[in-house]
């Protein structure tokens, strides 16, 4: 439902088409302001207002609604009056209504899964400098979902609790070997080495992460227990490494849908008999190629795995 509330000047055809396009996102009521015109979308009192100083073209919206609206906000052409998080949540909750021209955005949405390209994608995100990440991550430098036991928990507490929970689930014992695939800045392995006496290897494609992790190993005097390697998970089978435990936290999102089975095979190849593998990732109920704006500006090549596809593939490989 579209309701024109205020009108000082008549909307032109392009503006009317634009408001009509936005009208499908009507699960929550909101206002759209273009110039002096305010239109109401949905039923009930508006929960927020979207103010457009300049509207995207219909071609931009149809090519990628996500990129068109995301870049409009980045460029100051779009403002949210009200709760920004709520507005984002409302639009993203209706992502199925977004338009995406997969042919025009083929290279962005379905990027190459070769080692060379994935190394480039990881580097573009993680090698922009450790100082940048230290500005907004907690002291553990954990870059994956936290475990909030209580609403008032700090980010630091949530990350510590997450790692404690993971290490307990791994049933670690002194002298065991542990591989962390996509080890980040190393907090999980450092805690496992200090509290359980394990020997571990972390692998990452980020030179900056490797550098920081190596410094942390020295600071904690864990040189005899831990090492970090610049390595692609696909090189694990030929590495000669074997482990009692394998863990991967928030890395599967970088693997790519066509490589999930290969990932499981690589993990299986380095596990000792009776070993245990813990896999943590952001999941979705259904398969989706990923959001175009997120792929362009945040996680190049990133894909959210569905729960059902990973359970199916894991079962096929006796996990």
PLM region spans:
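Feature captures hydrophobic
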Residues: 1-159, 165, 169
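Conserved class I S-adenosyl-L-methionine
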Residues: 174-182
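Conserved SAM-binding loop of SAM-dependent methyltransferases across substrates and taxa
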Residues: 185-196
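Conserved SAM-binding strand-loop segment of SAM-dependent methyltransferases
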Residues: 220-235
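A short acidic, Gly/Pro-enriched loop at the edge of an enzyme's catalytic core
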Residues: 234-246
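A short glycine-rich, Lys/Arg-flanked "PGG" loop and its adjoining helix->strand segment in the class I
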Residues: 261-274
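Conserved beta-strand signature within the Rossmann-like core of class I S-adenosyl-L-methionine
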Residues: 274-282
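Short, glycine-/aromatic-enriched active-site segment of Class I SAM-dependent methyltransferases
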Residues: 283-301
């Amino acid at each position: 439902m579209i309701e024109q509330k205020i009108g000082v000047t008549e909307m032109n055809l392009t503006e009317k088409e634009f408001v009509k396009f936005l009208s499908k996102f009507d699960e929550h009521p909101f206002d759209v302001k273009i110039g002096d015109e305010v239109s109401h979308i949905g039923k009930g009192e508006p929960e927020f207002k979207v103010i457009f100083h300049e509207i995207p073209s219909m071609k931009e919206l149809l090519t990628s609604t996500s990129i068109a609206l995301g870049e409009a906000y980045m460029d100051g052409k779009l403002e949210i009056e009200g709760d920004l998080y709520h507005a984002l949540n409302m639009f993203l909750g209706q992502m199925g209504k977004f338009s995406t021209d997969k042919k025009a955005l083929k290279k962005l949405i379905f990027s190459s899964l070769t080692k060379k390209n994935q190394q480039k994608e990881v580097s573009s995100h993680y090698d922009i400098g450790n100082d940048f990440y230290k500005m907004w991550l907690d002291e553990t430098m954990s870059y994956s979902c936290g475990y909030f036991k209580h609403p008032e928990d700090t980010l630091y507490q949530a990350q510590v609790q997450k790692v404690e929970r993971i290490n307990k689930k791994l049933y670690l014992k002194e002298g065991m070997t542990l591989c962390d695939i996509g080890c980040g800045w190393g907090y999980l392995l450092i805690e496992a080495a200090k509290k359980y006496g394990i020997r571990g290897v972390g692998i990452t494609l980020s030179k900056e992460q490797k550098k920081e992790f190596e410094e942390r190993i020295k600071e904690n005097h864990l040189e005899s227990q831990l090492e970090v390697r610049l390595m692609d998970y696909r090189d694990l089978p030929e590495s000669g490494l074997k482990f009692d435990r394998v863990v991967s936290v928030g890395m599967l999102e970088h693997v790519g849908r066509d490589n999930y089975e290969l990932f499981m095979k690589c993990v299986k190849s380095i596990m000792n008999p009776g070993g245990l593998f813990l896999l943590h990732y952001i999941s979705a109920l259904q398969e989706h190629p990923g959001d175009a704006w997120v792929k362009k500006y945040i996680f190049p090549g990133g894909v959210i795995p569905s729960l059902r596809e990973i359970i199916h593939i894991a079962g096929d490989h006796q996990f």
